[in-house]
Structures are given as C-alpha cells and as structure tokens.
C-alpha cells in the first residue's frame, strides 16, 4: 500500500511539474481569445500540434527585450518568409525583413510581400484559401547577408511603424505599442502528420494591435536558425 501511495504521489508531482513547464511565465503577455476567429492556441494545436506556451521559443522570462528575436541563415539557398494565415485587418498587410540599425530606431527594412485578404474560421476548418493570396509583385524569398536579421509586418490601416521580431525596435519605432512591444510569438514548425519538427523552419504568430490575440498574421520562415 505504501509503495502504491509513493508511486501515485510521484506520478501526481510529475504531472504537476509537466503542466508547470508548459504554463505561461510570470512576465509573458496574456494571449486574448480571437474575436469571432480561431484562438491562437487552437490554431497551434490543430494545425501544427504545438503547445502555445510549452513550445514557445521566445518566452518572456524577465523582459520582452531579452527574448530571442533575430534569425540567421541556416544553409545554402534563399531564406523564405511568407504569410500562411491571415486573420487580422483586411486593409493591406505587408511583411519583410530588416537588419538592425546603428540604433534601435533605425532598422534597415526590406519589404517582400503584401496582401489584402482575411481568412475565415471556415477557411481554417476546410483548409481553403490558405495561404492568403499575395499582391502582384510580392516575393517570399531573399538572400540576407551573413549576419543576424529580424522580421517585420505592418498594416496600412494603422499608420504606425509596424511591428518587429525585436520588442526593443517596436518600442522605439511604434509609439502606439511602445508599452506592449512583444508582438511576435516564435515556434518550431512541426509537421502535423508525422509529429516531426521541420528543420530550420519556424512559425510566427504576429500581433499588430493591442488586444494580443497573436494571430493577426501567421507566418512561416524557412532556412533559418533562431539566434539565442
């Protein structure tokens, strides 16, 4: 009986510890439900088999500015970066990459693509209209120099500086969001069918508003490594 109790207690403690490991950190911004849209945790679980906090690669442990936020090219060939789900504003969305400037207020931005589209809950349920159609002249690949770079998105309807993978750049460039600059949640890309991680591939949930549902634009970036 005593051994059974010890075993049961060990299992319980292991379960609690596992749940704690996957829990939201103390300083992590809260993620809001999607307004009449799929919630971010549901998107991650159903499309990638990912845990919203358990698989998060840039959790806020102390300050947003201390989180991993830059990438480096992983191998031969171009880097690809494109939106895969569009749940934000239907005004024109833009995205691209940047090199950190001499100061945080001066990122060297390069635009790659734009689109004016919004997916529906039905699109995600039926896997239709995915990825969103890009505007003419858009590109999803680029050849960065051999140094760390960041990613960004923006929306024309907001008329601000956009949001960046580095929170400190958001705080410096975007006055509207300066007090809540953590706007990108970064994850490994997992193939749902096999359960295996896709090498050098990441999923990013972007937020460019203040409600922090983190699925305004969901992007995939390939042939990169996250700089820790």
Regions found by a protein language model. Name each.
Residues 10, 21-23:
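Small-side-chain structural scaffolding
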Residues 14-20:
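C-terminal segment of classical bacterial N-terminal signal peptides
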Residues 1-7:
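Bacterial N-terminal signal peptides that target proteins for export
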Residues 24-199, 205, 215:
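Extracellular distal adhesion/interaction modules in secreted or cell-surface proteins
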Residues 7-14:
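Hydrophobic helical h-region of N-terminal Sec-dependent signal peptides
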Residues 1, 23-24:
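Initiator methionine at the very start of the polypeptide chain
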Residues 197-228:
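Long, compositionally biased interface segments
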């Amino acid at each position: 009986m005593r051994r059974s109790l010890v075993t049961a207690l060990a299992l319980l403690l292991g379960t609690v510890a596992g749940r704690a490991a996957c829990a939201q950190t103390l300083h992590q911004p809260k993620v809001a439900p999607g307004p009449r849209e799929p919630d971010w945790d549901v998107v991650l679980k159903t499309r990638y088999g990912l845990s919203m906090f358990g698989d998060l690669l840039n959790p806020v442990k102390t300050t947003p500015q201390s989180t991993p936020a830059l990438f480096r090219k992983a191998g031969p060939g171009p880097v690809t970066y494109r939106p895969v789900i569009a749940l934000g504003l239907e005004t024109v969305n833009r995205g691209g990459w940047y090199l950190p400037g001499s100061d945080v207020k001066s990122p060297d931005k390069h635009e790659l693509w734009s689109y004016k589209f919004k997916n529906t809950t039905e699109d995600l349920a039926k896997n239709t209209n995915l990825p969103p159609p890009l505007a003419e002249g858009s590109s999803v690949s680029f050849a960065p120099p051999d140094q760390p770079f960041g990613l960004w998105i923006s929306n024309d309807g907001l008329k601000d500086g956009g949001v960046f993978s580095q929170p400190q750049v958001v705080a410096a460039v975007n006055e509207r969001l300066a007090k809540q600059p953590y706007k990108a949640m970064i994850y490994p890309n997992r193939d749902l069918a096999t359960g295996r991680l896709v090498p050098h591939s990441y999923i990013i949930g972007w937020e460019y508003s203040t409600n922090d549902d983190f699925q305004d634009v969901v992007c995939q970036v390939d042939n990169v490594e996250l700089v820790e």
